[in-house]
Amino acid sequence: MFKRYLQVTKPGIIMGNLISVAGGFFLASRGEIDWILMLATVIGLSLVVASGCAINNYIDRDIDAKMQRTRNRVTVNGEMSGKAAFFHGIVLGVIGFALLSYFTNWVAVAFAAFGYVVYVGLYTMYFKRKSVYGTFVGSLSGAVPPVVGYCAAAGQFDAGAAILLTMFCIWQMPHSYAIAIFRYKDYEAAGIPVLPVSQGIAKAKRHIILHIAAFAVVAALLPLTGYVGIGFMVVALATSLWWLAMALRGYRPGIDVNGWARQVFFFSIITVTALSVTMALDFNEVSPNLLVFAAH
């Protein structure tokens, strides 16, 4: 029984978000860590993410049944009813937002709510099914966790938080396009208009390369504005350039497109994990305090 209630929350997505929210929190803490606040932020946001995923599974039952990758989800194979998944998601969301509201600040809660509404309301219910821009809309919600972590610790939205939001939003694009390429048949069967399906793999390749290049530029803004040190700059440039070189290999004659897309996808995870860990460790002790919107 417990297993299906865990599976419906997409634990892999939760774990990925744990790393980014912790990275944002440690970056903003600048060595002065409130461990109770950190724990409450991580648990609270994890529950909010779990809630969104459970409700996403409830809404997506029809298209999940058409995709090889998702047809065995508990909401599709009958192990869990849609009603149970929905109310499970509601309970998790209430607890998660309650924790964030009690322990953090209105800025962090507002961004968590923004991400939730975008993911469940805009992305899941409309853009994923109807628009090629669904990936971009989804990327907005996917970029929220590190910003929530940052704002929970800093008590404000500043240039550092803005850079994190932009950086993680851009990162989502090549990451998601790569998935859409090697899962092309699934998305086509479900009628989901992701870029490779609706406008072709060639265009998706170009977008992957452009977004990786943009990601490298935005990631460099954190050290250039004084939020992190040279160590982050080195890791950011090394991983971004390697990722870009990997993406450019997609133009080699006779390339196995699915294999190439999987490599781009897996390295995207390595890149964002490396940067999340590095920004947690290589912070500057004094914040530049640029573009400040305080919580108090």
From Swiss-Prot:
Subcellular location as annotated: Cell inner membrane
Chief place where the protein resides: membrane
Keywords: Cell inner membrane, Cell membrane, Heme biosynthesis, Membrane, Transferase, Transmembrane, Transmembrane helix
Catalytic activity entry: heme b + (2E,6E)-farnesyl diphosphate + H2O = Fe(II)-heme o + diphosphate
GO biological process: heme O biosynthetic process
Catalytic activity, EC: 2.5.1.141
Enzyme class, UniProt record, top EC level: transferase
Any one Gene Ontology cellular component term annotated for this protein: plasma membrane
Bilayer topology: Multi-pass membrane protein
InterPro entries in the cross-refs: Protohaem_IX_farnesylTrfase, UbiA_prenyltransferase, UbiA_prenylTrfase_CS, UbiA_sf
Gene3D superfamilies attached to this UniProt entry: UbiA prenyltransferase
Pathway membership: Porphyrin-containing compound metabolism; heme O biosynthesis; heme O from protoheme: step 1/1
GO MF: protoheme IX farnesyltransferase activity
TM spans (from-to): 8-28, 35-55, 84-104, 107-127, 132-152, 162-182, 215-235, 264-284
Family annotation (NCBIfam families): cyoE_ctaB, PRK04375.1-1
More details: Carbon 2 of the heme B porphyrin ring is defined according to the Fischer nomenclature.
Family (UniProt): Belongs to the UbiA prenyltransferase family. Protoheme IX farnesyltransferase subfamily.
Functional summary from the UniProt entry: Converts heme B (protoheme IX) to heme O by substitution of the vinyl group on carbon 2 of heme B porphyrin ring with a hydroxyethyl farnesyl side group.
Protein name: Protoheme IX farnesyltransferase
Upper lineage: Bacteria, Pseudomonadati, Pseudomonadota, Gammaproteobacteria, Oceanospirillales
